[in-house]
Amino acid sequence: MIFTLASVPDTMKTLMQAYGAAVVACPTPESRWALMRQGIERLGWYPTGGFVLPPIGSNPYGVDGYKTIAYEVAEDLDWTAPDVLVVPSAYSDGLFGIWRGWTELHALGLVKTLPRMVAAEPFGPLANALERQLDVPERVVSGSSVAFSIASPYGTYQGLTALKDSHGVGVRITDEGIFEAQRALAREEGIFAEPSSIASVTAVMQLSSQRMFDPEQTIVAVITSTGLKDPGASRAWLPPVPSTPDDFDGLLTVLRDRYGLSLD
């Protein structure tokens, strides 16, 4: 059973159903959590996600699964930790789980240092908590965001703990920054990332423009999902595909007017 939101793109709902899930769309996160709680209490369902308000994170076993991202990054970097590791964040399951992975590798002596964790978030509940020196994140003002998977006004204690313990920061990102990062990564690296997952690269670009990194530092941005799950979001920065002209001169005109290509 998967409770999703009615606003989630149809492509994502199709993928969920294709893998065999019973998918139900709810109008709001709160209504989803209420139904989950009833299923847990009345029928003994086993929850893999959170179902309380304010959010406290997901099933601990699921959060621990994110530790393997730290293991993989450490292996790829020849068993050294990056200086900074950036993660798209909402309720911070990934942020906290990855941080736990690094602390365990460090405790075992497999890496000598720990990364500074960065949370990339549309509305900034963790950034707000750090700025105000809060012990627990408070709800912040929210709105719409193309990064809907992480567009939450709530942060969690776990996420704030990961940032505090690693001397990290929260970075507020915008739709404009997301589209810029999505376009750059697709065209320069051949990676088409979903808007929520490209939040990490967006934060890196933002911090880099503010000269927050040393040129010699190793920065890792975790990308969590393919853009093929939400291709409609990219229409905001892509021109409509033109119809095929009847003649070659017409084709040259279309290429010039629509794509800025002068080939004649």
What spans do the regions from the language model cover?
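A glycine-rich, Thr/Ser-enriched phosphate-binding loop motif common to dinucleotide/cofactor-binding enzymes
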Residues: 56-70, 194-198
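Active-site/ligand-binding loops adjacent to catalytic centers
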Residues: 33-54, 62, 104-192, 236-264
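Active-site-proximal loop->helix
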Residues: 1-39, 130-135, 230-236
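Catalytic phosphate/nucleotide-handling subdomain of diverse soluble enzymes
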Residues: 201-263
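Substrate-binding/catalytic subdomain of NAD(P)-dependent oxidoreductase enzymes
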Residues: 85-90, 115, 179-186, 190-209, ...
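Glycine-rich ThDP/TPP pyrophosphate-binding loop and its adjacent helix/strand module
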Residues: 73-100, 106-107
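Short glycine/serine/threonine-rich phosphate/pyrophosphate-binding segments
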Residues: 1, 9-13, 91-98, 126-129, ...
